[in-house]
């Protein structure tokens, strides 16, 4: 299990982490000297694939485009072929991970967004509507 996956509270949600392989890949360009004093926004990109597979052609080019425009990007490789709420929990944990590592990645922790395509878009929209729910808060130790 990778370091990011170790931060996901699967057991709190009654999910066995066995066989799950969520990971997060930073696509962060070194800031120019002019940008040294400015924290950057961040985006977490979620691929589509019908929750059956992850389409890399949808994530890498998009993350690179964000990064080339001064937005630190992260590619979330969420678990597929799993029951709800596994992928949602992984995305929520990814936002928490990026926020907790904001200093390390020169990120403004108040400017983190998510985007996705197809299933990844559904996942992003689900988080957008449930992010402050008691449902996710109980798993992520966040106050409502």
Located regions from the model:
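Primarily recognizes the serine-hydrolase "nucleophile elbow" in alpha/beta-hydrolase
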Residues: 93-144
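N-terminal cap/lid segment of alpha/beta-hydrolase-fold proteins
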Residues: 1-38, 85
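A fold-wide structural signal in alpha/beta-hydrolase
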Residues: 42, 67-77, 113
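Catalytic nucleophile-loop/oxyanion-hole region of alpha/beta-hydrolase
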Residues: 55-56, 75-109
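Active-site-proximal beta-strand/loop segments in catalytic clefts of secreted hydrolases
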Residues: 46-47, 76-79, 117, 127-128
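N-terminal cap/recognition module
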Residues: 51-52
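Short amphipathic alpha-helix adjacent to the substrate-entry channel of hydrolases
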Residues: 37, 55-74
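Short beta-strand element of the alpha/beta-hydrolase
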Residues: 39-48
């Amino acid at each position: 299990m990778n370091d990011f996956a170790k931060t996901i509270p699967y057991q709190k949600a009654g999910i066995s982490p066995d066989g799950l392989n969520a990971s997060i890949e930073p696509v962060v360009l070194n800031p120019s000297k002019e940008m040294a004093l400015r924290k950057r926004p961040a985006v977490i990109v979620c691929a589509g694939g019908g929750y059956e597979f992850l389409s890399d052609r949808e994530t890498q080019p998009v993350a690179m485009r964000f990064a080339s425009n001064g937005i630190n990007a992260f590619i979330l490789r969420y678990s597929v072929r799993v029951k709800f709420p596994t992928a949602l929990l992984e995305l929520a944990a990814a936002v928490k991970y990026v926020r907790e590592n904001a200093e390390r990645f020169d990120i403004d922790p108040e400017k983190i967004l998510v985007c996705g395509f197809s299933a990844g878009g559904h996942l992003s929209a689900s988080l957008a509507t449930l992010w402050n729910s008691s449902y996710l808060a109980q798993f992520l130790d966040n106050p409502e």
